[in-house]
Amino acid sequence: MKCRLIATGERAPAWVAQGFAEYQKRLSHWMPLELVEIEPGLRGKGRDAQRAIDDEGRRVLAALPKNAHVVALDVPGRPLSSEQLAQRMEHWRGQGRDLAFLIGGPEGHAADVVKSANESWSIGPLTLPHMLVRLIVAEQLYRAAAMLANHPYHRA
């Protein structure tokens, strides 16, 4: 099972890239994690925000792997504990499909992206910088994989 994290936004600052790379390396023992960065749509004075969201959505949909199980990170999504995420990962692994996790832009996902997702996941009600969400998702995927492998990383 391969996992692709598709994130809309600017290139990550060094500290995010380093943290993500660390969890990407750790996770590689159990599954490869690929980061695909989607350029954000143009915003600003005189620009149509909805057009930017729709443009981002088209690029996100084009980046989806064929037949992948798609999980959109979304505030109204289903909240999961680390243990529940591990259970979901075990279920997804049993399906034999690749995974794609989607992080939206500043205004969230385009409607077509949400509709294309098999499920949505909320990492909580806090408003977080999208760059930090990349790191949180990578860490939680590593934690879930470690739980499934009976690795001592998770000590709850």
From Swiss-Prot:
Pfam families referenced in this protein's UniProt entry, alphabetically: SPOUT_MTase
Entry EC no(s): 2.1.1.177
Binding site residues for S-adenosyl-L-methionine: 73, 104, 123-128
Record bears the keyword Transcription: no
Keyword Methyltransferase: yes
Family matches, as InterPro entries: Alpha/beta_knot_MTases, RlmH-like, tRNA_m1G_MTases_N
Subcellular location(s) of the protein: Cytoplasm
GO molecular function, one term: rRNA (pseudouridine-N3-)-methyltransferase activity
Location, primary (coarse class): cytoplasm
CC per GO annotation: cytoplasm
Record's keyword terms, sorted: Cytoplasm, Methyltransferase, rRNA processing, S-adenosyl-L-methionine, Transferase
Catalytic activity annotation: pseudouridine(1915) in 23S rRNA + S-adenosyl-L-methionine = N(3)-methylpseudouridine(1915) in 23S rRNA + S-adenosyl-L-homocysteine + H(+)
Subunit structure: Homodimer.
Family, per entry: Belongs to the RNA methyltransferase RlmH family.
Function as written in the Swiss-Prot or TrEMBL entry: Specifically methylates the pseudouridine at position 1915 (m3Psi1915) in 23S rRNA.
Official protein name in the record: Ribosomal RNA large subunit methyltransferase H
Organism: Xanthomonas campestris pv. campestris (strain ATCC 33913 / DSM 3586 / NCPPB 528 / LMG 568 / P 25)
